[in-house]
Amino acid sequence: VGWKWPETSVGWYRKDFSLDATDNGKHFEIHFDGIFRHAQIWVNGFYLGLEQSGYISQNYDINDYVHFDKPNFVTVRVDASLEEGWFYEGAGIYRHVWLVKSEPVHITPYGICVNTELNETFSTAKIRLGAEVVNDGRDKTACSVAYTLYNNEGEKVCTVAETQQELLPRAKADFNQLCMTVEKPNLWSPKNPYLYTLRTEVLSGNKVVDTRDTKIGIRKIDFDKDKGLFVNGEHVKIYGVCMHQDHAGVGSAIPDGLQVYRLQKLKEIGVNGYRSSHNPMTPAMIDACDSLGILVVEENRLTGINEYQIGQLKSMIMRDRNHPSIIAWSIGNEEWGIEWKNRGKEIAHTMSDCVNLFDPTRPSTVATSSGPAIVMDVDIAGYNYIMQNPVEEHRRNYPNRIAYGSEETTGCGTRGVYFDDIPNGRMASLNRVPELERDSAINRIERGWKFYAERDWLLGCFYWTGFDYRGEANPLVFPATNSEFGILDYCGFPKDEAYYLKSWWTDEPVLHIFPHWNLKGHEGEEVNIWAYSNCDEVELFVNGKSLGKKQMPKNGHLSWKAVYKPGKVKAIGYKNGKKLLTETIETTGNAAKLKTVETVNGDISVVDIYALDKKGNFVADACDEVKIKVSGKAEILGVGNGDPAWQAKERPLAGEDKQMFTVALFNGCAQVIVKNNSNIVEVSL
């Protein structure tokens, strides 16, 4: 699909549903979380509307169009012949669709508004409450609103209620005069993502006619121009990643449980920040960020000030404003044509004003690749790459500016590849090339983190990217079809540099050495052996011979040179002079068996598959084919292996067996995503 293939880029959906006659008199709406793109919607032949963007939610009142005595039909036309980004975006209905039934008097789709405030000692919270209620009935109605807060054990914390208002037919009313007080609140933070449930009830004639539950977090976010970011008074450095929204095997149609899995893999290496590059997020992903304690910069798709563009910005903010994970709204990314001009400054100023109007509790930001003008009039400046932005010069010239790294370079390379294989679309990580010149756009992951770690006034940074993603395969070309910028590959298997970040972003002891020792064809060649670790010192042994003990520099790495010969490499990490960790890699035999690790979130199981030799060692260069079989109600949704040039089919097609499939290992790893798994997933070589 896409602009090169217009004949295959238009798709139609048709779905029937039935309504019970007893529901006649209720109110019905249909909500689409996201359709890529240019989606036109009909119900029973009546046109509802058009949304051009593939990232904006659509909500339609269908009450006057539905039948109770015969089937109803929803028809959707999707046209993906034009892109919105320069990366893989998928096509079609890829997010949830909701049929919403309510009473005629009900809360509007984005009608709940919650803001939390804390006193100086963080011992008392005030929760400012708001609800927009609409009367979609035929008669004038009096109604009131009650709010009840529950803790995460389901216990009632407090209740408040607003006085009654009268609503004419089609009229709306705001119930926003109330405030709750919570003593000794359990605060939301990255380390303690505690969520309360706010229940909002609409009452008419002493009867509850609508109920909405909203997950909320009580927290206070502060930004300081000199000291950085504070959450509930505690200094927090952003350990962030930028992310697109696709995954091996399923593309952009990521199930909710897989969204959680992706965040879990990032948290394992210490990630606490997520930038939704470059579009509003799937609601399920923001829910996952709330529950896992991830700080979010949510990004608008289009930078502009016409009615439609500001409407997109407003839609994102109104939909997502109650999420405690969101700390800032980004108005755009790398607008090369205007970011260095006064025109860009003026547009950013207007959009920033709109952000502050729609949500006075959070700052605006924008990501610039080189032009300083566009960041002048937003609340927080976002710099894409220290190699492209004179960050320190801007600091000297504008000392009151709050700033962070909205994008920073990773090593860029293929998992498990240590010698370039360009014809086959795979490359060794750029992270390991000699130190580059200051004006080079290529930056080592290590140099980037040192820069941000050493400057308290910078909030932190978001690396490009957390996961590999489809498209934008540069600097490679076909057969490479995936980017290789990820810290984790397309499945979430860690590349070596993931352990660099884990060393400095977590308190967990880390010792990781590479490359693997299955370097067939490179016998007799000198090899650089690296260690990522947060130990004080590391000693390296190659085939039993010590190459010396070295002191680990802060936020750095260690390296030794050795001539490659099959055998064994061992590293010993020391803390306070005592042996703490030992890591061993050795030349292995062929893959003889498989190890599986299953992660279950809701109805989704992600099964990671690893190749082992007869001795139980991980075979880091295995590319064998694996047969997969599931049973019962389980279905295979997709498979992957992290190979950026893999051209095989990734999921069963319509009409094919969804319980048997094959996948090739890539450098020892593969993955299968299963729905409704209640049995063991069988895998075999």
Predicted regions and their residues:
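Extended acidic/polar, glycine-enriched regions
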Residues: 67-69, 130-224, 559-567, 575, ...
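Short flexible loop/turn segments that cap and initiate beta-strands
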Residues: 140-146, 159, 190-197, 534-536, ...
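Accessory beta-strand-rich segments of carbohydrate-active enzymes
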Residues: 3-115, 136-137, 152-153, 280-283, ...
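Solvent-exposed serine/threonine-rich low-complexity stretches and specific carbohydrate-binding patches
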Residues: 48-49, 157-170, 545-553, 637-661
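Extended substrate-binding grooves/exosites of carbohydrate-active enzymes
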Residues: 46, 51, 96, 102-104, ...
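Short S/T/G/P-enriched beta-strand
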Residues: 223, 506-528, 534, 585-606, ...
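Short, hydrophobic beta-strand segments
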Residues: 62-64, 177-188, 559-564, 655-678
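Beta-strand-rich structural segments
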Residues: 129-133, 148, 201, 527-533, ...
